[in-house]
Amino acid sequence: MSHPLIPFRANFLRAPRVLSMEIVAPVITTFRGGRLDPELFANHVKNITSKGVDVVFVAGTTGLGPALSLQEKMELTDAATSAARRVIVQVASLNADEAIALAKYAESRGAEAVASLPPYYFPRLSERQIAKYFRDLCSAVSIPVFLYNYPAAVGRDVDARAAKELGCIRGVKDTNESLAHTLAYKRYLPQARVYNGSDSLVFASFAVRLDGVVASSANYLPELLAGIRDAVAAGDIERARSLQFLLDEIVESARHIGYAAAVYELVEIFQGYEAGEPRGPVYPLDPEEKAWLRAAVAKAKSQLRL
């Protein structure tokens, strides 16, 4: 499929702000030689928030959250809250006390909310135990607590009915390829902020007026996501769909060689600066993989005016 040349920067600067449809970036964690680089992280956050990102989501899956120490998560929280106005910190831990400690720290640093995966790894936790984890987290802070629902990673689906039963969830990030699944949270939790977490459903999420999207592509193409949102707001569904298809081409290419590591290279390809590297077990792309990725997205890049 061919796509029109799209001058995103100019369009973004002219377009009206659409506050009800937020772009949330699950920001990458920037490492150099296996060590966290907070300054590089903050500079990356400043760049993407200047180009359409509304909220920064720290220590999520794209940010390699489960592989970070508590101290590293705190350092990222410091860097994020100093660089961005709106920050959500993902606090999940197999140590519930550490999750609560990070949530309290995030609140003290000015984060607007915290989020958490359900307790994972332990396959037979009861619903009562899951509920206690979230209720203890909610009781520990006064800022909103988001459910981060990611069944493919956690092995458990805390669906809309279950989320309502928790009684304290004020937001949801649903990493799910089923838009109907995500929409159900708006039905059962109408006052909650509900985001879908799939790059392939950015257009669809905006079209049905979810509160926003949490899209890893916001790290490397925030302008494209802003273009989709603006097209939906203007009623230009054909344009929005065309932009989604362009995004799909890029994401599918990156998934071919390991998406979590490819995001770092895509930042350099599309934003023009080096964003560090991931850390094992998400290992950096090798030179051959980087060359393959650049060739694979070259056609898509040629159709963007960035």
Swiss-Prot record:
Please give the Gene Ontology molecular function terms for this protein. Answer: 2-dehydro-3-deoxy-D-gluconate aldolase activity; 2-dehydro-3-deoxy-phosphogluconate aldolase activity; 4-hydroxy-tetrahydrodipicolinate synthase activity
Q: What is its EC number?
A: 4.1.2.14, 4.1.2.51
Report the superkingdom from the record.
Answer: Archaea
Specify whether Transmembrane is a keyword of the entry. Answer: no
What does the record give as its pathway? Answer: Carbohydrate acid metabolism; 2-dehydro-3-deoxy-D-gluconate degradation; D-glyceraldehyde 3-phosphate and pyruvate from 2-dehydro-3-deoxy-D-gluconate: step 2/2
Q: Does the keyword Lyase apply?
A: yes
One Pfam family of this protein, by short name?
DHDPS
Matching entries from Gene3D superfamilies are given as: Aldolase class I
Cysteines engaged in disulfide bonds, as pairs: none
- Site, Proton shuttle: residue positions: Y148
Q: Where is the active site?
A: K173
Membrane-spanning regions, if any?
A: none
Q: Which residues bind substrate?
A: T61, T62, Y148, N149, Y150, K173, D174, T175
Q: Which reaction does it catalyse?
A: 2-dehydro-3-deoxy-6-phospho-D-gluconate = D-glyceraldehyde 3-phosphate + pyruvate; 2-dehydro-3-deoxy-D-gluconate = D-glyceraldehyde + pyruvate
Which parts of the chain are coiled coil?
Answer: none
Enzyme's top EC category: lyase
Q: Which family does it belong to?
A: Belongs to the DapA family. KDPG aldolase subfamily.
Q: What does this protein do?
A: Involved in the degradation of glucose via the Entner-Doudoroff pathway. Catalyzes the reversible cleavage of 2-keto-3-deoxy-6-phosphogluconate (KDPG) and 2-keto-3-deoxygluconate (KDG) forming pyruvate and glyceraldehyde 3-phosphate or glyceraldehyde, respectively. It is not able to use 2-keto-3-deoxy-6-phosphogalactonate (KDPGal) and 2-keto-3-deoxygalactonate (KDGal) as substrate.
User: NCBIfam families per the record?
Assistant: Arch_KDGaldase
- State whether it acts alone or in a complex, and with which partners, per the record: Homotetramer; dimer of dimers.
Give the protein's recorded name.
2-dehydro-3-deoxy-D-gluconate/2-dehydro-3-deoxy-phosphogluconate aldolase
